[in-house]
Amino acid sequence: MRIVQLDLEHEAALRDFLAELAAHGETDIHGFFGEPEWTHAETVAAFTRWSCGDPPPGWVPSTTSFLVDGARILGVSNFRHWLTPHLLERGGHVGYTVRPSERGRGHAPRLLRDAARRARRMGLRQLLVVCDSGNLASARVIEKCGGAFESESPTDSGPIRRYWIDLRRAAAPTGRTDHL
């Protein structure tokens, strides 16, 4: 298993990943902002531009990463490089989704830890991660990765839980970050 950036070789794997989510009624995919009408090449190009600091107007630079095992995508994460007022209120720095058939196997913490490492390398001191209040599995993932509960906030789509991960405290004294 490895965490990679989307490439042209992942076209069939991405289609399969999205189909499994859709079959489970999941169309609002946290961590994935591709457009249905885009070709795979357009999706790859957009993710590359966004990670290099060239997002669409009104968006922030972000890095979308995929956890893959062989030719199969297991999960996706999106790390927003900074927060707008909207992201501070309800979106956070990181969104992630694991395909339904792979949930409960430790993939979500791996994606969140990778995003935390990226954030630390960019000089961030804290990482805001939110989840729907009813999503107890995601809340456990965030807490497992060092998230400290801040508050529960109402939104148009229901209440969310807000957590902060202190990236300064999360680093091991040896400089290792693989424990995150």
Regions found by a protein language model. Name each.
Residues 77, 103, 132:
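Mobile, glycine-rich extracellular loop/lid and propeptide segments
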Residues 1-93, 100, 118, 156-180:
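GNAT-family acyltransferases
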Residues 129-139:
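Conserved beta-strand-loop-alpha-helix junction that forms the acyl-donor binding cleft
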Residues 130, 143-164:
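Conserved catalytic-core motifs of GNAT/GCN5-like acyltransferases
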Residues 119-130:
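Conserved GNAT acetyl-CoA-binding A-motif
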Residues 95-98, 104-121, 139-144:
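Conserved acetyl-CoA-binding loop-helix of GNAT-fold acetyltransferases
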